[in-house]
Amino acid sequence: MDGKPQDIAAVHYWGKTRPAWHLLPCHCLDVAATGREYLLRHHRLRRCLAAALGLPEPVFLAWFTFFLALHDLGKFAQSFQARRTDVLLRLQPGLGAPTKTSPERHDSLGYGFWNEHLRPRLRNGD
């Protein structure tokens, strides 16, 4: 890898396709930044949510932003990406036409990935 954007695996996935496709990592970061900015401007809401969770506001804001960035984690699933093969093949030209699709929603796919792969690693300190 020589540091070019195309060498980063995450840039080969789409997050939105209308009006034009938008890279999934960019979409996730856009949502996280927007949500963070919203809470920074709404002090009372931020204070209330942090207090309800028993967290200091800066800690709550950091976790909130982190989870917003993960909100579309399930869209990395090949079965989701295959819903728009035209965009997928443009981003991953060597892939060939994907045949695996799933009726499962991307939120369920992301939650499954979180529970099966990420959460256990956090528990183990990986």
Placement of each model-derived feature along the sequence:
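Metal-dependent phosphohydrolase cores
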Residues: M1-D126
